[in-house]
Amino acid sequence: MALHSAIKGKLISVIGDEDTCVGFLLGGVGEINKNRHPNFMVVDKNTAVSELEDCFKRFLKRDDIDIILINQNCAELIRHVIDAHTSPVPAVLEIPSKDHPYDASKDSILRRARGMFNPEDLVR
């Protein structure tokens, strides 16, 4: 059983290394849609950047996906595609991998979100 948005029945997708994908699959995120397309992609050293980019674009177009989790090191390879995605849904969240820790300075989505808030609004 996959983790679904309670109201709409939407999915979380995962793009990342084998350990990341297996962890989320064990947590119940894995699904295959009616066209037999999974909601995850395992990326390894032999994965072409074009494959990664195509998968990300497919996930963006799927109406059953609300959140895309992507290892930050994978996101760096397709940064131009991620930066071009400005719609709030599906939300794109960059996550660390086992071998690559999270670096907030590389996360363009976090930078964009920070720009939406006035620092004085956060101080009380």
From Swiss-Prot:
<dbReference type="Pfam" id="PF01990">
    <property type="entry name" value="ATP-synt_F"/>
</dbReference>
<keyword id="KW-0597">Phosphoprotein</keyword>
<keyword id="KW-0813">Transport</keyword>
<dbReference type="GO" id="GO:0033181">
    <property type="term" value="C:plasma membrane proton-transporting V-type ATPase complex"/>
</dbReference>
<dbReference type="GO" id="GO:1902600">
    <property type="term" value="P:proton transmembrane transport"/>
</dbReference>
<feature type="modified residue" description="Phosphoserine">
    <location>
        <position position="87"/>
    </location>
</feature>
<dbReference type="GO" id="GO:0046961">
    <property type="term" value="F:proton-transporting ATPase activity, rotational mechanism"/>
</dbReference>
<dbReference type="InterPro" id="IPR036906">
    <property type="entry name" value="ATPase_V1_fsu_sf"/>
</dbReference>
<dbReference type="InterPro" id="IPR005772">
    <property type="entry name" value="ATPase_V1-cplx_fsu_euk"/>
</dbReference>
<dbReference type="GO" id="GO:0016020">
    <property type="term" value="C:membrane"/>
</dbReference>
<dbReference type="GO" id="GO:0000221">
    <property type="term" value="C:vacuolar proton-transporting V-type ATPase, V1 domain"/>
</dbReference>
<keyword id="KW-0375">Hydrogen ion transport</keyword>
<protein>
    <recommendedName>
        <fullName>V-type proton ATPase subunit F 1</fullName>
    </recommendedName>
</protein>
<comment type="function">
    <text>Subunit of the V1 complex of vacuolar(H+)-ATPase (V-ATPase), a multisubunit enzyme composed of a peripheral complex (V1) that hydrolyzes ATP and a membrane integral complex (V0) that translocates protons. V-ATPase is responsible for acidifying and maintaining the pH of intracellular compartments and in some cell types, is targeted to the plasma membrane, where it is responsible for acidifying the extracellular environment.</text>
</comment>
<comment type="similarity">
    <text>Belongs to the V-ATPase F subunit family.</text>
</comment>
<keyword id="KW-0406">Ion transport</keyword>
<dbReference type="InterPro" id="IPR008218">
    <property type="entry name" value="ATPase_V1-cplx_f_g_su"/>
</dbReference>
<comment type="subunit">
    <text>V-ATPase is a heteromultimeric enzyme made up of two complexes: the ATP-hydrolytic V1 complex and the proton translocation V0 complex. The V1 complex consists of three catalytic AB heterodimers that form a heterohexamer, three peripheral stalks each consisting of EG heterodimers, one central rotor including subunits D and F, and the regulatory subunits C and H. The proton translocation complex V0 consists of the proton transport subunit a, a ring of proteolipid subunits c9c'', rotary subunit d, subunits e and f, and the accessory subunits VhaAC45 and ATP6AP2.</text>
</comment>
